[in-house]
Amino acid sequence: TAAEVTTEAASESAAETSAAAGDEMTVTYPVTITDHLGREVTIEKQPESFVSGYYISTSLMIALGLDDQLVGVEAKADKRNIYKLSAPELTELPSVGTAKEFDLEGCAALKPDLVIVPTKLKDSIPAMEELGLTVIAVNPEDQTKLFETIDMISTAADVVEKGQELEYWISDALESLKKSLDGVETPSVYLAGNSALLQTAGPEMYQSTLIENAGGVNAASDITDTYWADTSYEQILSWNPDYIVLAADADYDVDSVLNDSALADCTTVKEGHIAQIPSDIEALDSPVPASFLGSYYVASILHPDVVTEDDFKTTEKNFYETFYGIKK
């Protein structure tokens, strides 16, 4: 169907644009990159080794073909299905901790040419620089910032062409989805958080964009929190969403929501309009390159007559095969 994105169509579009860009694809060092903290970071020569202190950037580096240059990654890498399926060697690499507890000395001991961290680690960056590390901070919290992150890393590593191919693939997929959903009614969606049903994503979060791209409206669009916001049963009943969608890594399930007596009067529950975003390869509601697939999945729930489950599965299969070498 129209919403389905084939590997051939996306690759042709990427190839045409790459050809038009010509010589701009090769990076000349030193190169200066402005990161998401507004820091101007000069990279003197092409990096040969990287540390990624953030799952989002690690997944992106696999998609850019840079996983074999990683010498250290974030904690709990062995729990990530995406790594096991696409780059199992990453599960054996030294851990540099988390955004809450980053291992500065451990990172420095790996002597990476470039370190990529989330902007949450901004207070640790001066100490990293004192240890002689070159650091860029990223915060891909929406589609624009995701593409900026792809640009930063692909420029730093001199894989601009691969970065552009990835961006064109994602853009084509979202454009195809948008055309398919043109003119549909937009039901309201309550997106429930990972750690609790009574947490939701406000309009500043990537998950809100995911809902809009899927042809829905965020039921919590009037809240001002920039992270997961606490809410209440009364608030959910007041919003009376058409659908409740659970975050991919929620530690509760669809049945527990359907059987929650506090929501017995909610139309959504009565009609069984509850779903959970898939996480069999990786969480499709986190701002990884594949996050556009989260919109495809939610669209298949909200508008199954326009975007089918097969559209989602075919597009998912083609994307992961093209950029991660995963055959489903």
What are these regions (language model features)?
Residues 1-46:
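Short, low-complexity disordered leader/linker segments with a strong preference
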Residues 33, 40, 123-199, 220-222, ...:
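Extracytoplasmic substrate-binding proteins
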Residues 51-53, 69-74, 114-118, 135-138, ...:
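Structural recognition of the beta-strand scaffold that forms the well-ordered cores
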Residues 52-110, 114-116, 120, 219:
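A short, structured surface patch at a secondary-structure boundary
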Residues 66, 89-91, 131-132, 214-215, ...:
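Short, structured coil segments at secondary-structure junctions
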Residues 96-99, 103-117, 133, 232-249:
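Proline-aspartate-enriched helix->loop->beta-strand connector
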Residues 121-130, 246-260:
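A ligand-binding cleft/hinge motif common to bilobed small-molecule-binding domains
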Residues 200-228:
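Alpha-helical, coiled-coil/dimerization segments enriched in small aliphatic residues
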